[in-house]
From Swiss-Prot:
Occurrences of domain Thyroglobulin type-1 (ranges): 107-172, 177-244
Single GO BP term: iron ion transport
Main location: secreted
Organism: Aquarana catesbeiana
Signal sequence coordinates: 1-19
Name assigned to this protein: Saxiphilin
Tissue expression summary: Plasma. Highest levels of transcripts found in the liver, the lung, the pancreas and the brain.
Disulfide bridges in this chain: 29-64, 39-55, 110-130, 141-148, 150-172, 180-202, 222-244, 277-360, 322-335, 332-343, 388-402, 495-527, 505-518, 552-839, 570-799, 607-685, 641-655, 652-668, 725-739
Function: Binds specifically to the neurotoxin saxitoxin. Its physiological role may be to transport or sequester an endogenous organic molecule other than Fe(3+). It may participate in a detoxification mechanism for neutralizing a microbial toxin.
GO cellular component, one term: early endosome
Family to which the UniProt record says this protein belongs: Belongs to the transferrin family.
Entry keyword annotation includes RNA-binding: no
């Protein structure tokens, strides 16, 4: 057994032997002996309660990805280019923690100054002390001199508080943060994290940036010195923002650059035939960004991966190279690793990584080095400079003006389906709080993480490689590897959300003449992600999923039309219509309960279809909060049944679980195991216990006048119920069009913007064949489901109508201003989700 593996095994056994019998473990995969040494240092020095770090050694990035896939390790850090490769078969890994960078500054000023001080490694140097949120500790002490003093929120020394060692220290008070930073911290954390909440942008002094941007809605606006919006500056997404002031925003991106010696004289368009040094073949900054620019500028002769691998093409472009991880002999000739380790995609190759690429250039093994801007140092500016794609050269500190593009920071990855994600997150967040040496090491540069890292940030659980990298970069990487396949303009790949839908879709595909193909996801969100990635083209979504889809950039192409009393729009496209025939959300009461109206429902007993449902929860809750200063719904009603709520809360008191199986403990379950769940359940709740039920208007007609034979419903009459109107009056249930809480927008077929015309054309053709009046409706029916209900389309759909896009904000255009104002006006975060958080990552 080799000594390095004996050492690795020893440390692994030691770390396991000291772990408690039931202690949780995070097995970190190290790609080299140097990374293993750093990992073992952390095992001994970074003690996180209840979670043990275990180091697993493999010989390369690819071997570590395999180990994680096979369950032999749990996590590793990858460059953004490697994240793409890891996301594919056979690895199927996903990013869970991001590594944000700061180009000039970071909002956590204390963390930045601390990192800079640690990087200098100067004996006797003052190192700021920061709290777990990245703020300055009120009292600062110099580790070498022993002097202590008080600071304000911005880290500035407070006059008269300096005390030498041995004397009683001044009492330091925690100073109030500037208003912007305080609001930012509340938005980002606090006791109650709300996804989609607006997070203010602050400058390094804690003042409001002149231009503010809402990460979820895409709106931007200008503010004054105290953060108040300046009238007339609000700009919707897709429009050019108002000019407030030039900014240098904090970014989670870095720059890919080309570094050369000043003594050389060639320009970017003269790279062919030169000797090259690269950080690695899987790296974005040292390889993929360069290839993309060379192809775009037509400097590289390459007919695509179908005819020739990109490595083969690049081996003919450069004379010789060192590209760790490459398979072409010519691309490894300049590497200097020992036998068996030469050109390895790990630190075992001395020229691996950003600092390795620089070393390759420095040792005159190459004419140009392709690496990341964070590896640049002012101390090299006398000898080196940047090679710019516009055929100029610039100083090293001008990397923002002279680069090959911006690319995302790397991430920590684990298995897509893993029970270790929470442990990994908890370990790294706690290690960060305890100021463990995650981001530096005496053993070398960029081990486990990049040395330029200031902090780690958890990603939304919905984030995958596509959502993290963004559309442009993801598809660029697919093109380089031959994974890209342009969708056909004559075929729609329809996404189905369950097995029954897939069966119906397959039947449709068989008679479509090749116009329809079928994909399958496990839920509507899965279909949204498939369409975003280009793996599917269309899906029909109910309104509760439309907000997420629109926030993620999809657009409605076609809408369902349900009004069977007016078939005109189906016969003649473009005919005017005012009623889609869709549902209305109503507040239903017993006619005998004369004293209740909309204005006095506080304290009453309420029945809801389920938490998150549009008619039974989102609309009534949004209205109540708007009209009652954001009242807490838990305490607004006397008692409720809102399936899906905390079982100990007031919102579950009226629920009864499963009357046929009281031992099942399903009270308040968001499923039919709660008798009061869903539309029928909420109506039953009203009949048996409640004062008001929030339901779609059709519920009363479907469960009265002999329509429902159940014991609790068989004798009910529709005339025994009334509607509560928002003006305080009441009305018969037949007046649902005028006495409602809100209309509900129709379901829509969504797709990518560039695919709208193709989807509309193909769907119109299929409807002419298999719609209600279709020529071939005896062969197949779009709006009928003999294997279930409402499959692919709602069964009461009369026809599909092209969405009439108006030149306004897409949210108001689809939802309609009344609905949009009702649901989102009071709190835009009301419908936020992990998917929206993932979709609204600011990409490079």
């Amino acid at each position: 057994m080799a000594p390095t593996f004996q050492t690795a095994l020893f440390f692994t056994i030691i770390s396991l032997s000291f772990a408690a019998p039931n202690a949780k473990q995070v097995r970190w995969c190290a790609i080299s002996d140097l990374e293993q040494k750093k990992c073992n240092d952390l095992v001994g020095s970074c003690n996180v309660p209840d979670i043990t770090l275990v180091c697993v050694l493999r010989s390369s990035t690819e071997d570590c990805m395999t180990a994680i896939k096979d369950g032999q390790a749990d996590a590793m850090f990858l460059d953004s280019g490697e994240v793409y490769e890891a996301s594919k078969d056979p690895y199927n890994l996903k990013p869970i923690i991001a590594e944000p960078y700061s180009s000039n500054r970071d909002l956590q000023k204390c963390l930045k100054e601390r990192q800079q001080a640690l990087a200098k490694k100067m004996i006797g140097h003052y190192i700021p002390q920061c709290d777990e949120k990245g703020n300055y500790q009120p009292q600062q002490c110099h580790g070498s001199t022993g002097h202590c003093w008080c600071v304000n929120a911005m880290g500035e020394k407070i006059s008269g508080t300096n005390t030498p060692p041995g004397q009683t220290r001044a009492t330091c008070e925690r100073h109030e943060l500037p208003k912007c930073l305080k609001e930012r911290q509340v938005a980002l954390g606090g006791d109650e994290k709300v996804l989609g909440r607006f997070v203010p942008q602050c400058d390094e002094k804690g003042n409001y940036e002149p231009q503010q941007f809402h990460g979820s809605t895409g709106y931007s606006w200008c503010v004054n010195a105290i953060g108040e919006e300046i009238a007339g500056t609000k700009t919707p997404p897709g429009k050019i923002p108002a000019t407030c002031q030039k900014h240098d925003l904090v970014t989670t991106c870095h720059y890919a650059v080309a570094m050369v010696k000043k003594s050389s004289a060639f320009q970017f368009n003269q790279l062919k035939g030169k000797r090259s040094c690269h950080s690695g073949v899987s790296k974005t900054d040292g390889w993929k960004a360069l290839v993309t620019v060379l192809v775009e500028k037509k400097l590289l002769s390459w007919d695509g991966p179908a005819k020739e691998s990109i490595q083969r093409a690049m081996s003919k472009f450069f004379s010789v190279s060192c590209i760790p991880g490459a398979t072409q002999t010519n691309l490894c000739k300049q590497c200097k690793g020992e036998e068996g380790k030469n050109c390895k995609n790990s630190h075992d190759e001395p020229y691996y990584g950003n600092y390795g690429a620089f070393r390759c250039l420095k040792e005159d093994m190459g004419d140009v080095a392709f690496l990341r801007s964070t590896a640049l140092s002012d101390e090299h500016s006398e000898v080196y400079e940047l090679l710019c794609p516009d055929n100029t050269r610039k100083p090293l500190n001008k990397y923002k003006e002279c680069n090959l593009g911006t690319v995302p920071a790397g991430t920590v990855v684990t298995r897509k389906i893993s029970d270790k994600t929470e442990d990994i997150n908890n370990f790294l967040m706690e290690a960060q709080k305890r100021q463990c040496k995650l981001f530096s090491s005496a053993h070398g540069k960029d081990l486990m993480f990049d040395d330029s890292t200031l902090q780690l940030a958890l990603l939304s659980s919905e984030v995958d490689a596509f959502l993290y990298l963004g559309v442009k970069l993801f598809h660029a990487m697919k093109a380089l590897t031959g994974d890209a396949h342009l969708p056909s303009k004559n075929k729609v790949r329809w996404c189905t959300i369950n097995k029954l839908e897939k069966m119906k879709c397959d039947d449709w595909s068989a008679v479509s003449g090749g116009a329809i193909a079928c994909t399958e996801a496990s839920c509507p969100k899965g279909c949204v992600k498939q369409i975003l990635k280009g793996e599917a083209d269309a899906v029909k979504l109910e309104v509760q999923y439309m907000y997420e889809a629109l926030m993620c950039g999809l657009l409605p192409a076609v809408e369902e039309y349900h009004n069977k009393d007016d078939f005109g729009p189906c016969k003649t496209p473009g005919s005017p219509y005012t009623d889609f025939g869709t549902l209305r959300a109503v507040a239903l009461v017993k006619k005998s309960n004369k004293d209740i109206n909309w204005n006095n429902i506080k304290g009453k007993k309420s029945c809801h279809t389920g938490v998150g449902d549009i008619a039974g929860w989102v609309i009534p809750v949004s209205l109540i909060r708007r009209q009652n200063d954001n009242s807490d719904i838990d305490s607004f009603f006397g008692e409720s049944c809102a399936p899906g709520s905390d079982t100990k809360s007031n919102l579950c008191k009226l629920c009864i679980g499963d009357p046929k199986n009281s031992a099942a403990n399903t009270k308040c379950s968001l499923s039919d195991k709660e008798a009061y769940y869903g539309n029928q359940g909420a109506f039953r709740c009203l009949v048996e216990k409640g004062d008001v039920a929030f339901v779609p208007h059709t519920v009363v007609f479907e469960n009265t006048d002999g329509k429902n034979p159940a014991v609790w419903a068989k004798n009910l009459k529709s005339e025994d119920f009334e509607l509560l109107c928002l003006d305080g009056s009441r009305a018969p249930v037949s007046n649902y069009k005028s006495c409602k809480l809100s209309g509900i927008p129709p379901p829509a077929i969504v797709t990518r913007e560039e695919s709208i015309s193709d989807v509309v054309r193909i769907v119109a053709n299929q409807q002419s064949l298999y719609g209600r009046k279709g020529f071939e409706k005896d062969m197949f029916q779009l709006f009928s489901s003999n294997k279930g209900n409402n499959l692919l389309f709602n069964d009461n759909t009369q026809c599909l109508i092209t969405f009439d896009r108006q030149p306004k904000d897409i949210m108001e255009d689809y939802f309609g201003k009344p609905y949009y104002t009702t649901v989102y006006g009071a709190s835009r975060s009301a419908m936020s989700s992990e998917l929206i958080s993932a979709c609204t990552i600011k990409h490079c």
